Amino acid sequence: MAQQYQPGQRWISDSEAELGLGTILAQDGRLLTVLYPATGDTRQYSLRNAPLTRVRFSPGDQITHFEGWKLTVREVEDIDGLMVYHGLDGQNQPRTLPETQLSNFIQFRLASDRLFAGQIDPLSWFSLRYNTLQHTSKQMQSALWGLGGCRAQPIAHQLHIAREVADRSAPRVLLADEVGLGKTIEAGLVIHRQLLSGRANRVLILVPENLQHQWLVEMRRRFNLQVALFDAERFIESDASNPFEDAQLALVALEWLVDDEKAQDALFAAGWDLMVVDEAHHLVWHEDQASTEYSLVEQLAQVIPGVLLLTATPEQLGQDSHFARLRLLDPNRFHDLAAFRAESEHYRPVAEAVQELLDEGRLSPKAHATIQGFLGAEGEALLAAVNDGDTQASARLIRELLDRHGTGRVLFRNTRAAIQGFPERQLHPYPLATPEQYRDLPAGEHAELYPEVAFQAQGEAADDERWWRFDPRVDWLIDTLKMLKRTKVLVICAHAETAMDLEDALRVRSGIPASVFHEGMSILERDRAAAYFADEEFGAQVLICSEIGSEGRNFQFAHHLVMFDLPAHPDLLEQRIGRLDRIGQKHTIQLHIPYLQDSPQERLFQWYHEGLNAFLNTCPTGNALQHQFGPRLLPLLEGGESKAWDALVADARGERERLEAELHTGRDRLLELNSGGAGEGQALVEDILEQDDQFALPIYMETLFDAFGIDSEDHSENALILKPSEKMLDASFPLGDDEGVTITYDRAQALSREDMQFLTWEHPMVQGGMDLVLSGSMGNTAVALIKNKALKPGTVLLELLFVSEVVAPRSLQLGRYLPPAALRCLLDANGNDLASRVAFETLNDQLESVPRASANKFVQAQRDVLAKRISGGEEKILPIHVERVAEAQRRLAAEADEELARLVALQAVNPSVRDSEIDALRKQREDGLAMLEKAALRLEAIRVLVAG
């Protein structure tokens, strides 16, 4: 029968519930006009199939007048098609409320309200809501939360440091890993995990200007963190009173900040939870004087609770330098340089004893005495067990020593010597004759090392006279690429102009498909170039990069590197090799170095190879040697006697060997063990790889995309293209691009194809989609037909989903103890709960959809019965909720008490444990227990099942 519409009646939109209560204005022929006063919107619907549900309240319901007072309904009267509600107001006085005077802002979000208002959702949405709750609960309890979503190969020492640091309240640490071990990834993991956990909300990243772009790329590509890059132009053009306050994550160049006092004032006023400083070894400090940069960072460190300093300076080459960094972290603890040196010497024999235990599996009398003197009477039983060959006791002893290590909690330093998994390197030098065209170039830096740039700078050359027509390195490159055939080859040169010219040369002279990559391209253009290079089937054989353009990129799927020229500094040389030489590289790195004979290029090659040994091994001493020998090196590169040159190379080699020996003998094995995680990181790696192999996420996301009207189609193996369809349900779905995106769930694919989104449980698209499901009301009601021969036709089952949760600041981490969990109840006609006997999936497979009109009619007919059974379901679930809360309180108290006891005991023997850290943990314990006391049980969803 057709609906009867009367002006003044209140109806609610089935598709736009957020509009609030609608009022019928007019019925004109086949059109129905409805006003939604809450938003001021007017809608016209076809009279035959208007997506509207009549608003009818029942005795017991509480309703609101547009002036704000509430009425508890006792009786409902229908007068000429309009409802009039009679009942008691807040003062228990009898009152009447016609439906025309109902509040316009009433929304039916509660499951029971929506069910009885006729807002019944598709079965698929009910399942989606249930699965979303289950996955949310599981992820909040996961030890991998914030660690597994990074677009990087999981590496043990990085994961250990990230977890150790990110799980502290306001961490203040120095990350001093050797070059190539991934300090930027470690910092990104810490930032990401702190943000997800709520321990930090606003992060300031200070970097040298030349590394701003690298950080921007790393944070966005690896962690999906939207970092705001600040410079003078952005700061001046901003309309905000304080431009920094609008950015959750700000990336700032230290050079600009030092010169701009206005920007400094704004930065201090903005308020930050965590500060990250890269290249911290460039902050100059001496006992009698500090640089402007150091002083600025020092002032910021005094007002920002969390501080992360990144430095590449080897400790033994700069103990004073490390002290300067540690001073920034904890000036009370590190106040005296002489005392710091003495303390470091105090730990050296202990570290040597630990090394002996690791190498020999037992302790010599001397090592035993050293450790006994260090631990005192407390360590005697442990040492006795170690001497008896107890391997577990050995592990406990090492952990005890690590805990007491002077800087073990604030300083992390991993070395290549201690970390396994790096590839070997092979060097292939190619001396080539210097062409005549380069011999008479005007003097200058370009002419010395980059003659092609100097040649081009002389003026526009005819096409047949361009430098790549006569430079023998180009002929060599073409021949080498042909010899390597389909093998991927990365070519790096110093300048963007050279990279673009080489692409022209390869196209014109050989037809070899090449992709180019330089700083003049946008990030999107670089992504496309990198993707073209990475494509195994149809991609380019060669990618030609400029020095700056390749910063922060990872091309470890290739293992042939051509250096078309050599950089002027060993750090840049290591950065070039580091594009391929990473943990996880499966092949030996092949380094191809063409150079022009009898030129500065030849001498620079000899300097790096014979003096610094920088091609075949990492060169931690390179920066110091370049600084020490620079005054002799530069004049001799341009020319000069071969005898003087040979002497310089020999001197540099001798000094390098001396420094390397000093580094080796001075290795702090205790520090390395602590930084590497002593096996804990490897367990995290295995857990992440196991999670990667599961299909739960792709299966869940497919249902999510279907629900929101996102079309997916195959792109290639392990990759999908997502596009919004015409039926897209919610324009706010975080697809990332209105035109569509390409995604992969495969980590290896994501590492080689940076143009693809790497979907994990932590990805903004996944998290945003789940938030849309749980924050909306869609899916919290359903009615279905159940096909089961064991059930008598007409039998009604009621499935209820309750959520047991605590609403609290994320920083308290209560989701670890009481994650929002869906507590399911399946009631039969006698009130028995069958949920433990009938799994959700089993039940789901037996259900069929019911037309909405029929479902609504059935619900209205059974309203009183259903309302009683809903109350009965809550009574059955409440004891489970109460026990969950009690268990959460017990776990929180036990964990916090154990950690507090450890820190208090540790503080007695290791002053690096700050009072503020212990106080913060005590407060977190108290606040957490208080918030758990307020945990609530909420009816999340209702499904009515009728046997047929």
Swiss-Prot record:
Binding site for ATP: D177, E178, V179, G180, L181, G182, K183, T184
EC number(s) stated in the UniProt entry for this protein: 3.6.4.-
Pfam families documented for this protein: Helicase_C (PF00271), RapA_C (PF12137), SNF2-rel_dom (PF00176), Tudor_1_RapA (PF18339), Tudor_RapA (PF18337)
Helicase C-terminal domain segment(s): 473-627
PROSITE patterns: HELICASE_ATP_BIND_1, HELICASE_CTER
Residue ranges of domain Helicase ATP-binding in the record: 164-332
A GO molecular function held by the record: helicase activity
Protein name (record): RNA polymerase-associated protein RapA
UniProt organism field: Pseudomonas putida (strain GB-1)
Organism placement in taxonomy: Bacteria, Pseudomonadati, Pseudomonadota, Gammaproteobacteria, Pseudomonadales
Primary gene name: rapA
